From Swiss-Prot:
This is Large ribosomal subunit protein uL2m. The keyword Ribonucleoprotein applies. PANTHER family: LARGE RIBOSOMAL SUBUNIT PROTEIN UL2M (PTHR13691:SF5), RIBOSOMAL PROTEIN L2 (PTHR13691). Belongs to the universal ribosomal protein uL2 family. GO terms for biological process: mitochondrial translation. Pfam families: Ribosomal_L2 (PF00181), Ribosomal_L2_C (PF03947). GO terms for molecular function: RNA binding; structural constituent of ribosome; transferase activity. It comes from the Eukaryota. Gene3D superfamilies: 2.30.30.30, Nucleic acid-binding proteins, Ribosomal protein L2, domain 3.
Length: 266
């Protein structure tokens, strides 16, 4: 197996071209650039390829391109290797499976349709559209909660952003929480921690010249806060009002956070 792995390794990795916050040569995100070189690991987000096949977890690795850890899985009989996002409490040597049918045991790491998962269970790597691959709850320590089965077609799911939305029962999801839960406790004690990740120092717009930023120049106040490109900032929604998926949002994340505060205050 080791000899086979040495040959397959080059097919799971590739070089990664650094964008440094640019889009077609123009600055899209300020204060980005200068990160360490890294190789990109190909992650399998569409697990329906390996339907009803047992996947053997060979090892759990660190991935510099994302906050969560990744797990190297293999189908031993066929000699196939690929990476998936690792789940918390997933151990080396365990077996996981993807199935469209109802699973006998709700083991952490198994993937199935939302209609087969009971209410009150934490899930991650959720599809938004059927057979489109996982899109939601892929960052470290994130998970979503199935609140209730809304009807035969949809389930009401509470995302990690506190947003409550309807998701089709035919969409696939993985049971459990994404790995590396302790990442939120990590502190950047030195500037080099940020520079190695490609985050450069941020200059306030107020300290710039008028030609460089809407807040620049001696005159203070008189206008609403804006971004460097001139768009309104601070407590202004950037989501398109005509977006098709807005019809599936029952409670937005802003409204849900206000409701949670009111419940705590009594």
């Amino acid at each position: 197996m080791v000899l086979n792995w040495r040959g397959v390794k080059s097919r799971l990795y590739s070089g990664k071209r650094r964008i440094d916050g640019r889009n077609k040569g123009l600055i899209a995100i300020r204060s980005r650039g200068g990160a360490l070189k890294r190789k990109y690991r190909y992650i399998e987000h569409y697990k329906q390829k390996w339907m009803d096949k047992w996947l053997f977890v060979m090892r759990i690795e660190y991935d510099p391109n994302r906050s969560a850890h990744i797990a190297l899985c293999s189908i031993l009989k066929e000699g196939i290797y690929f990476y998936v996002i690792s789940i918390a409490k997933l151990e080396v040597g365990s077996l996981i499976i993807t199935s469209a049918l109802k699973l006998g045991t709700l083991q952490v790491g198994n993937t199935t349709k939302i209609k087969n998962i009971p209410e009150g269970l934490l899930i991650n790597n959720i599809e938004l559209i059927e057979n489109s691959g996982s899109k939601i709850s892929r960052a470290a320590g994130t998970s979503s909660l199935i609140i209730k089965k809304y009807n035969k077609k949809y389930s009401l799911v509470k995302l990690s952003s506190k947003e409550c939305r309807l998701i089709s029962n035919e969409c696939y999801a993985t049971i459990g929480t994404v790995s590396n839960i302790e990442r939120k406790l990590k502190q950047n004690k030195k500037a080099s921690y940020s520079r190695k990740r490609g985050i450069r120092p941020i200059v306030r717009g107020l300290a710039m010249n008028p030609v460089d930023h809407p807040h620049g120049g001696r005159t203070k106040g008189g206008v609403h806060w804006k971004s460097f490109s001139g768009k309104l900032a601070y407590n202004v929604s950037s989501r398109k009002k005509t977006k098709m998926t807005s019809r599936y949002i029952i409670i937005g994340h802003r409204k849900q956070k206000i409701m949670d505060k009111q419940i705590k205050n009594g």
